């Protein structure tokens, strides 16, 4: 009584190649870093600005 290996499952159906995500258009306006620099420089606080104050 020789053991017979089970037959491999049927080959998975060929998957369609993944499409690349559509390139997102760049948003107009200043970058986040520029906005932070402007907010901190406009602040009158001498000790800096907290994260909560920036939001």
From Swiss-Prot:
Biased composition regions of type Low complexity, renumbered to the chain: 1-15
Q: What is its main location?
A: nucleus
| Region (Disordered) location | 1-28
Indicate the segments forming the H15 domain, all copies. 28-55
Q: Which GO terms describe its cellular component?
A: extracellular region; nucleosome; nucleus
Keyword Magnesium: yes or no?
no
Q: What InterPro entries does this protein's entry cite? A: Histone_H1/H5_H15, WH-like_DNA-bd_sf
Q: Where is the composition biased (Basic residues)?
A: 16-27
UniProt entry keywords in alphabetical sequence: Acetylation, Antibiotic, Antimicrobial, Chromosome, DNA-binding, Nucleus, Secreted
Q: What is the lineage of its organism?
A: Eukaryota, Metazoa, Chordata, Craniata, Vertebrata
Q: Does the keyword Secreted apply?
A: yes
Modified residues annotated as N-acetylalanine in this record:
2
Which named protein is this? Histone H1
Q: Which GO terms describe its biological process?
A: defense response to bacterium; nucleosome assembly
User: Any idea which GO molecular function terms this record carries?
Assistant: DNA binding
According to its UniProt entry, the function of this protein is described as: Histones H1 are necessary for the condensation of nucleosome chains into higher-order structures. SAMP H1 has antibacterial activity against Gram-negative bacteria E.coli, A.salmonicida subsp salmonicida, V.anguillarum and S.typhimurium and Gram-positive bacteria B.subtilis and L.ivanovii.
> What protein family is recorded?
Belongs to the histone H1/H5 family.
Q: What organism does the UniProt record list as the source?
A: Salmo salar (Atlantic salmon)
